[in-house]
Amino acid sequence: MTDSRTNLLNLDRAGLDAFFTCLGEKPFRARQVLRWIHQRFVTDFSAMTDLNKSLRERLTESAVISLPEIIKQHRSADGTHKWLLRMHGNNCIETVFIPEGDRGTLCISSQIGCILDCSFCATGKQGFNRNLAVSEIIGQLWLANKTLGRDPKGERIITNVVMMGMGEPLANFNNVVTAMNLMLDDFSYGLSWRRVTLSTAGMVPAMDRLRAVCPVNLAVSLHAPTDKLRDELVPLNKKYPLQDLLSACRRYVAGDRRRAVTFEYVMLAGVNDSLPHARALLRLLRGLPAKVNLIPFNPFSGSVYRRSDAATIDRFREELLRGGIMTVTRKTRGDDIAAACGQLAGRVQDRTRRTMDRQRLVSVLPRSPLAS
């Protein structure tokens, strides 16, 4: 039987304000309940002791706080954690926590599978089912915070969030933005925009919308310096080629000298890792406040690609540094538990939907004037 009660985990502060107004309550109740849910990790309304008994009873009748279910938890030798979480419909997604010094980063998924089918990514190859609900996105942060607890000083262990897990976040725009509103809200998780990063393959119109409503840090899954090569690696490039993508990046950081776009570049042996590729990348990014993360390819079953060797990656990085682009090589973390970049796969029950849904997505996206 379907539960008709409202899942409060789907609502940010504005949504909760509206919910309590409908109950005849003052909007300040939203702030109280946000603290209980997201700061004290309480899901039982009867335990919310600063609410009067009558309101607690009405909440029990009309609302619920429903979370994903932890199926498995793995811990890597390097301290990386990976959770397999069951969502509604018996599909599963993966969430990863990466500790490093005084920084702890949670990598969050936004879809069950991924609709974009990038050729080098395990998520894209395992199918697509649906977008995650707000409760399923913010629920990953809720569960990880509750599981990991706080450090000896009482500080939260999770200091940063990256929307870089399974799925294309901007293809689930409204739910992702609502979840990020909760991440940034001082009555919920209180993260600075500098500590929340969204990674996109390049959904240009949605990038402009994001800048207008929730301008967190932007990362772009670039992976190639030319349209010809990027068409092969990232099929969305056929819709939004590099000139459009880079123009959107410039608009995103315009007027704010504190901002730069991070470009992710997976290093594929013999495909995109030569010095001519590095020089083409320098030309492409010229004049744009940019950082480049070089990502050693993480193999998965059935992949045709190989990881560039360390010497090749070093030469590529040095070429970019000489050209004035801040460049780092991302340290591979959690590969012994398949938690490294590009390895997340989860479990999708219906793998037949990706082609249909991808075609529908492409058909409704505004077309770039430069796309052929």
Swiss-Prot record:
Pfam family, one: Radical_SAM
PROSITE patterns (UniProt xref): RADICAL_SAM
Disulphide bridges, residue numbers: C107-C341
Needed co-factor(s): [4Fe-4S] cluster
Enzyme Commission code: 2.1.1.192
GO molecular function per UniProt: 4 iron, 4 sulfur cluster binding; metal ion binding; rRNA (adenine(2503)-C2-)-methyltransferase activity; rRNA binding; tRNA (adenine(37)-C2)-methyltransferase activity; tRNA binding
Note on cofactor: Binds 1 [4Fe-4S] cluster. The cluster is coordinated with 3 cysteines and an exchangeable S-adenosyl-L-methionine.
List of residues binding [4Fe-4S] cluster: C114, C118, C121
Any one of the GO BP annotations: rRNA base methylation
Enzyme class of the recorded protein, top EC level: transferase
Top-level taxon in the UniProt lineage: Bacteria
Binding site for S-adenosyl-L-methionine: G167, E168, S199, S221, L222, H223, N298
Domain Radical SAM core: 100-335
Catalytic center residues: E94 (proton acceptor), C341 (s-methylcysteine intermediate)
Catalytic activity: adenosine(2503) in 23S rRNA + 2 reduced [2Fe-2S]-[ferredoxin] + 2 S-adenosyl-L-methionine = 2-methyladenosine(2503) in 23S rRNA + 5'-deoxyadenosine + L-methionine + 2 oxidized [2Fe-2S]-[ferredoxin] + S-adenosyl-L-homocysteine; adenosine(37) in tRNA + 2 reduced [2Fe-2S]-[ferredoxin] + 2 S-adenosyl-L-methionine = 2-methyladenosine(37) in tRNA + 5'-deoxyadenosine + L-methionine + 2 oxidized [2Fe-2S]-[ferredoxin] + S-adenosyl-L-homocysteine
Main location per the UniProt record: cytoplasm
Family of the protein in this entry: Belongs to the radical SAM superfamily. RlmN family.
Further comment found in the protein's record: Reaction proceeds by a ping-pong mechanism involving intermediate methylation of a conserved cysteine residue.
Role of this protein: Specifically methylates position 2 of adenine 2503 in 23S rRNA and position 2 of adenine 37 in tRNAs. m2A2503 modification seems to play a crucial role in the proofreading step occurring at the peptidyl transferase center and thus would serve to optimize ribosomal fidelity.
Protein's recorded name: Dual-specificity RNA methyltransferase RlmN
Organism: Nitrosococcus oceani (strain ATCC 19707 / BCRC 17464 / JCM 30415 / NCIMB 11848 / C-107)
